[in-house]
């Protein structure tokens, strides 16, 4: 029995990155030998065991053979005669087909170290094309390592295009698509994930609402980048710089979906694109089974982001109604989230990346003023039932009006 550290832990150690999870491969052992050594079996489809002390995963070396459609259509063979090289060959990318033995020696039968040094994401073998989930995984790795200048090998991107054109991605379940997307959205450069999907044709299949934005023009005065799809990826990049929150990044991604519905004869203007985009956000989220809290914020951002941009001319009553509409009284975090997405929208434009966004500050300040109005005083003044809410709203409007006159007066006409 020989045990090897494999995959991501070896890869990240060679890149000088923190190693989070460790996966191990055991060569020359049977399931019974693992159980006798105190390991706990957890794998249902193939032999995977948990170490009795560390609880890290130890898998018996195995091979896989395509036996059906999609990413689940595989038959696994695990036995003591399966070699380490055979196990590594089933991996997706050469940089993940690395192993390290007890002496610290690197086993690299598929030249993963060479590709690490060349900053290349290259598939190990033609078997890559048998698993459509790998298209999304490669896109996610491209996003994860974009800051290290990794790129996808030409032959791998060509294979990804072939897989997409053959309809392989249609076998993916919504849950798997969302899981990969969720992980990609938390990387340093989530926009790269969607760009790669577009480059191989997968964006049109999996995210048609986003793909439809490419080629849709916006007024050059406000959007020097012109293309709404390009702007969408720029805003996502900016959102990733402004916030680590998945909610903020996803909402930013969806903020302009409504522009894809604008009739061509009305281009490049997109009046009413915010409210129009709400149903597309709902459609996308239902299809991919996006969590409700992410969906709800994305719908609010789609509907109200343009309103935030006009903050200096908003009436105090409109500002308080906005807080009502986003349910800020019960979910105060939404004020900050919407401020960040609106800022990402403004700064996600060519030449505006370093722009100040005072509207975000004003939104936060107005919220602090409005929520500081004490409910207790309204109740103690003798108001009852629905009168409490009406009086509280009046006092909040008055407080915001007083603040706005001093801190955010409307621009001179």
UniProtKB/Swiss-Prot annotation:
Protein name in UniProt: Multifunctional CCA protein
The EC number(s) attached to this protein equal: 2.7.7.72, 3.1.3.-, 3.1.4.-
* Species this protein is from: Salmonella paratyphi C (strain RKS4594)
Q: What quaternary arrangement does the UniProt entry report?
A: Monomer. Can also form homodimers and oligomers.
Domain text: Comprises two domains: an N-terminal domain containing the nucleotidyltransferase activity and a C-terminal HD domain associated with both phosphodiesterase and phosphatase activities.
- Organism domain of life: Bacteria
One GO biological process term: RNA repair
Listed A to Z, the keywords are: ATP-binding, Hydrolase, Magnesium, Metal-binding, Multifunctional enzyme, Nickel, Nucleotide-binding, Nucleotidyltransferase, RNA repair, RNA-binding, Transferase, tRNA processing
Which amino acid positions bind ATP, per UniProt?
A: 8, 11, 91, 137, 140
Q: Give start and end of each HD domain.
A: 228-329
Q: Which CDD domains match?
A: HDc (cd00077), NT_ClassII-CCAase (cd05398)
Other remarks on this protein: A single active site specifically recognizes both ATP and CTP and is responsible for their addition.
Q: Does the keyword Magnesium apply?
A: yes
Entry GO MF terms = ATP binding; CCA tRNA nucleotidyltransferase activity; cyclic-nucleotide phosphodiesterase activity; magnesium ion binding; phosphatase activity; tRNA binding
